[in-house]
Amino acid sequence: MALKATNFFTEPEYKLQDDLILDIRDLHVSFKVKDGIMQAVRGVDLKVKKGSIVGIVGESGSGKSVCVKSIIGFNDGAKTTAKLMNFKNIDISKMKKHQWQYYRGTYVSYISQDPLFSLNPTMTIGRQVKEAIYVSCKRRYYQTKSDLKYDLQTERIDLDTYKEKLAQAKETYKAKTTKAAVHAKTLEILNFIGIDQAEKRLKAFPSEFSGGMRQRIVIAIAVATEPDLIIADEPTTALDVTIQAKALNLIKQLRDLLNITIIFISHNISLIANFCDFVYVMYAGRLVEKGLVEEIFTNPVHPYTWALMASIPEGTDKNAPLTSIPGYIPNMLSPPKGDAFAARNQFALAIDFEHQPPFFDVTETHKAATWLLHPQAPKVEMPADVKEKIAITRKALAIKMPSQPVKQPKSNGNKKTKTKSAR
């Protein structure tokens, strides 16, 4: 079916800071199910800098995937609201179906958990990569035509400028979509991601590759469209440890080479520690802690982050049982009052069961939503097993723990609290 030129994207009232590519504020996503309304995401704020790798970590069911799928319109049947959803000064909260068609795979690419379900089993990998290149070029060309037409109609440009820029866009489109150009780019990408004998393997089908190689092909398709942002939704879950490391290293190389921004989703906190620049910790549809990777993994302050750190298998005595977080994520049909983690938190205070904590500042970039950071809260010692895991992480990150205690945090809220322990 021929692609149809879209209207221009809606521009948000708020313009992004120069260093940001994405700014989301107060995001809520819910689903109507048989038993009621499932509140998957509850008031999430995300800021993503250009060229960064941002990690979102949490247990399965925390709302990580639902949160990022709202960025690409993949939450079918969901009710999505936000005060702001700004991607490259495009208001994605007002996107229509035909606009999503241009946006996905052109500006944003998505890498899913299982490559087997991302690839068409009836098409060769060469054809699939080439199709991604061709379609993205065509979409960008038609979008440019639409934008130029709008600029002409609104007198942002004159007729001569319109004709000149349109001719340039057409020339670029033709040059990039010749058979030779698309073939050459496909080979270049496959060679870079480590597909041996790329020319020969162009005619191979997905079933002829291992799981690790299939995931590399999915990554190739994702970068072939030259997106500004790649969302990697637990892309290494189905891979063994050795292949995981290779896949992550490949994604990082592509980020450095192409200056692509990456949002990386995982329930594996050790992967996040070794891969990301900035980290959001998510639980029961809310963010509970956020900060630079070295801040989160050398000075975590939220009990949920402590629990995730303690569950890292690295450094655990081979004869000792693995640590797990007791209890379960609450039923999001009726989220609990107060802090959703309180029932599983051995350090919970009485107020945790009554009021949702605001974010407290640990540093300018490190914040956490826990009443333990309130000036009147009792002092709580970080668990010994968490300290052990921090020591391991510190070595991996090649940085040192702060030698001085953290300054007394400042609250973003004015609520007074009772600090009596509930335990």
Curated annotation (Swiss-Prot):
Reactions this protein catalyses: a [peptide](out) + ATP + H2O = a [peptide](in) + ADP + phosphate + H(+)
Q: Which family does it belong to?
A: Belongs to the ABC transporter superfamily.
Please list the GO biological process terms of this entry.
peptide transport; protein transport
Bias category Basic residues: which stretches?
413-423
| Taxonomic path | Bacteria, Bacillati, Mycoplasmatota, Mycoplasmoidales, Mycoplasmoidaceae
This chain belongs to the protein called: Oligopeptide transport ATP-binding protein OppD
Q: Where in the cell is it found?
A: Cell membrane
Q: Which GO terms describe its cellular component?
A: plasma membrane
Q: Which organism is it from?
A: Mycoplasma pneumoniae (strain ATCC 29342 / M129 / Subtype 1)
Q: How does it sit in the membrane?
A: Peripheral membrane protein
